[in-house]
Amino acid sequence: MRIGIMGGTFDPIHIGHLLLGEFAYEQFHLDEVWFLPNGNPPHKEVEDTEEALAHRVEMVRLAVRENPHFQLSLHEAKKDCHSYTYKTLQEFHALYPENEYFFILGADSLFSIEQWKYFKEIFPSCTILAAMRDDKDSFDMQRQIQYLETNYQAKIELLQAPLLEISSTTIRNRAAQNRSIRYICLLYTSPSPR
């Protein structure tokens, strides 16, 4: 099967995440898109409480439940240690060697991927589907893709998706200020309790 992977803290999951998954599914003829809430992300200073993690997982479950080709994967959420993309991909290949994996990410992640732990191990494990953002023009994206393909033999495809300037950080900030998050989030999602 052709499996798209969307990882992240999803605090909260929002329409931008779901649109990326849907557009990747259609454009690259994926069989499923797996959403992986990260249980212990290495880039966060404070670890989630069990309650906060359960809240994030439940938000993702609710967000993907009505889409037959979206799946919630608890692979990273169940771990007590930090989860890293390279390791998750290795584990998926060991568990499901028949699958072909497509890692879905935004332009900001494509430009910072060399800072990820053992980032070189990611490239042989998947095709990266990179979605553009407004702040990265197509020339910069093409140059970064060519750089990663040339230097690391990465397989990268450009994901054509709507450019929505939505981030979970913006949503959390708006909610903390008692400002509306209507139409940004789904009705049943909200930032996790701290």
Residue ranges and their predicted role:
Residues P68-F70, N151-I156:
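A short helix-to-beta-strand connector/capping loop
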Residues D31-V33, E100, T127:
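Residues at the starts of beta-strands that form the adenosine-phosphate
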Residues M1-H29, W34-G39, G106-S109:
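N-terminal catalytic cores of NTP/NDP-binding nucleotidyl/phosphoryl-transfer enzymes
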